[in-house]
Amino acid sequence: MAPGTKKKSDMAKFTFYKDRLMTFKNFEYDRDPDAKCTSQAVAQAGFYCTGPQSGKCAFCNKELDFDPEDDPWYEHTKRDEPCEFVRIGKLDDSELTINDTVRLSQTAMIMTKLFEHEMMINNLSNHSSSDALFDQLKKVPNTASTTKSNSRRGK
């Protein structure tokens, strides 16, 4: 990647229904003609596929295991965690405004970073020696400014 360019967030690609739906290849309940909880319903409720009966919201990082009779939208809305997708409440992409789309994409990027930082903290806390911790910290990119002040003023 060229210097100064930013990698697109992994979760931002799930802003739209069609992209979330594409993640459901072998969703178990799609084979059940009586199931209310289909891949279409789960994707429409804001989830991408994480397993044969589960999905994760790109906008609140909530992962749920579903039953065939579940209503994915209801299950999503009854969770305590605040979710931007639930707050906006538009299950049809054609109803999303540009502002809605930007907010969802930004939220997905923030949630990706939050998840990455939580994973890094968990990994760091699992290291027992200070040498192992130091090795992990060396791998973290330095985001602090490295420019020096050109001020000629005295102290």
From Swiss-Prot:
Main localization (coarse): nucleus
Subcellular location: Chromosome; Cytoplasm, Cytoskeleton, Spindle; Midbody
Gene3D superfamilies: Inhibitor Of Apoptosis Protein (2mihbC-IAP-1), Chain A
Record GO biological process: chromosome condensation; chromosome segregation; egg-laying behavior; inductive cell migration; meiotic cell cycle; mitotic cell cycle; mitotic cytokinesis; mitotic spindle midzone assembly
Disruption phenotype: RNAi-mediated knockdown results in high embryonic lethality. Causes a failure in cytokinesis resulting in a lack of cellularization and in polyploidy. Defective extrusion of the polar body during oogenesis. Defects in chromosome condensation, compromised alignment and segregation of paired homologs and defects in spindle midzone formation during meiosis and mitosis. Disruption of air-2 and hcp-1 localization to chromosomes. Decreased phosphorylation of histone H3 'Ser-10' and decreased acetylation of histone H3 'Lys-14' and 'Lys-9'.
InterPro entries assigned to the protein according to its UniProt record, in alphabetical order: Baculoviral_IAP, BIR_rpt
Record keyword Zinc present: yes
Pfam families the UniProt entry points to: BIR
GO molecular function, one term: metal ion binding
Tissue specificity remark: Expressed in oocytes and sperm.
Family, as annotated: Belongs to the IAP family.
Full protein name: Chromosomal passenger complex protein bir-1
The organism of origin for this protein: Caenorhabditis elegans
Species classification: Eukaryota, Metazoa, Ecdysozoa, Nematoda, Chromadorea
